[in-house]
Amino acid sequence: MKREIAVGTRVSKLAMWQARWVVDRLKELCPGCSFRIVGIRTLGDRILDAALVKIGDKGLFTKELEAAMLRGEIDMAVHSMKDLPTELPEGLVIGAVCKREHPADVLVSRRGKKLDELPGGALVGTSSLRRCAQLLWYRDDLRMVNLRGNINTRLRKLEEENLDAAVLAYAGLFRMGRQDAITQVIPFDICLPAVGQGSIGVEVRSDDGEVLELVKKIDHRESRLAVFAERAFLRRLEGGCQVPVGALGTVENDRLRLEGVVATPDGKQLVRSFVEGNGGDAAAIGLRLAEKLLELGAGEILKRARQEERRE
């Protein structure tokens, strides 16, 4: 490939790390290729003084990257898959889902206490309604506090704002070399992750055959099947940052197991179940699980969540 390939990414340290990681993998497979990383500030990067639910928009961390790609300013965009809306703009596709890092949430506690050891009424920081809902379902005495910013900012605020603990994604801490901060990996039976959590995705123009062929080389089939099942599940439920939805797909011997949860933001109502099937049927499995949860009452939960969102 003769042309220089422009790789778009958000400007945070974690996003830049992920873009460099992708470029390093591509260079291994295409030593003669030339890459240039382009940092682009997104709406979600610019608004840091409000909870994600208050901003109320999908694509908070991706729209500007996608617009730049459609204008031809960049050739691919590297995303955290959990940030990428389930509906992509016309002309763009997911060219690769890289091998997934551990998708769990983790507790970072100021005094080294695990979730069950936190005092009654403990202050727990997170920007995620999904985490709030599931943790309040598990422990309704916790007091959840909005906590946004990059990893180092959140770890600093944990101390400055006198919080007892914060909940972050394992993958981000691992990639930033901050595993030392982790007090506890929260079990999946307490808190299912966000759709796509732990996965790096590469979005490309659908008509750019050269770049498509290149990025396909770093696609990890099992990760892609799991994430695509999760995204199909989320798409059917029409959930975004504003609705507490979690999911986790796992693939073993080409069998896909998908578990999902829908809850009210206050954690008072929660439905959770799973389905299994052939790995090649990822999208259908996602739809099956969504329908199953809707039958169990997820529709009413989502309706209530959206009504509360509009009132706010």
Curated annotation (Swiss-Prot):
InterPro entries, sorted: HemC, Porphobilin_deaminase_cofac_BS, Porphobilin_deaminase_N, Porphobilinogen_deaminase_C, Porphobilinogen_deaminase_C_sf
Enzyme Commission code: 2.5.1.61
Assigned GO CC terms: cytoplasm
Keyword match Transferase: yes
Annotated PROSITE patterns: PORPHOBILINOGEN_DEAM
A Pfam family the protein falls into: Porphobil_deam
UniProt-recorded Gene Ontology molecular function terms: hydroxymethylbilane synthase activity
Modified residues (S-(dipyrrolylmethanemethyl)cysteine): C241
Domain of life from the UniProt record: Bacteria
Catalytic activity: 4 porphobilinogen + H2O = hydroxymethylbilane + 4 NH4(+)
Cofactor, free-text remark: Binds 1 dipyrromethane group covalently.
Assembly description: Monomer.
Protein family: Belongs to the HMBS family.
HAMAP family linked to this entry: Porphobil_deam
Protein name: Porphobilinogen deaminase
Organism: Pelotomaculum thermopropionicum (strain DSM 13744 / JCM 10971 / SI)
